[in-house]
Amino acid sequence: EPDAVTIFGKTWDFHVREALRISLEENLELIYDSLAYLKENVPEVIYDAEHFFDGYKANPEYAIKTLEAAQQAGVDCIVLCDTNGGSLPYEVAEIIKKLKKKIKTPLGIHAHNDSECAVANSLIAVENGAVHVQGTINGFGERCGNANLC
């Protein structure tokens, strides 16, 4: 029996329609149902909101709805993912400040390093209230890597 589990879900409406090929509402149900089930069976559930920053920039209302579905399911932490690594620190700061007014579940950050901002984005996220940071030793990770925790 695991003490904790991390699962990801789609937050960008483009990916919901084009990759999953389901409706936006079906995706919200999928997020809620999956996380609620896990929360009933595992003490700690962490939700990684994949492509959150891209999704937020394209359709903030829907991206926030995906986080609200996770929050309603009772997750312990919602991790905002800069999956393509293209967000800049000022964007991360502004978005987290806005989210803190709507989302009461603790927030985290998962930053990729495509624009060489993974560490900066992680630090600015913590400065603005994130309590969970995902990264790797020496920054190793897919494409250009993730936030270097060393």
List the model feature ranges, each with a label.
Residues 1-107, 122-130:
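Alpha/beta enzyme core
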Residues 110-137:
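Small-aliphatic-rich amphipathic alpha-helix that forms the alpha element of a beta-alpha
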Residues 9-11, 128-145:
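Glycine-rich phosphate-binding active-site loops on the catalytic face of alpha/beta enzymes
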Residues 92, 144-150:
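Histidine/acidic-residue-rich catalytic or RNA/ligand-binding cores of hydrolases
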Residues 13-15, 86, 116, 139-144:
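Short gly/pro/ser/thr-enriched loop/turn and capping motifs at secondary-structure boundaries
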Residues 64, 116-119, 146:
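Glycine-rich phosphate-binding loop at the start of an alpha helix
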Residues 48-50, 81, 110-112, 136, ...:
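Structural motif
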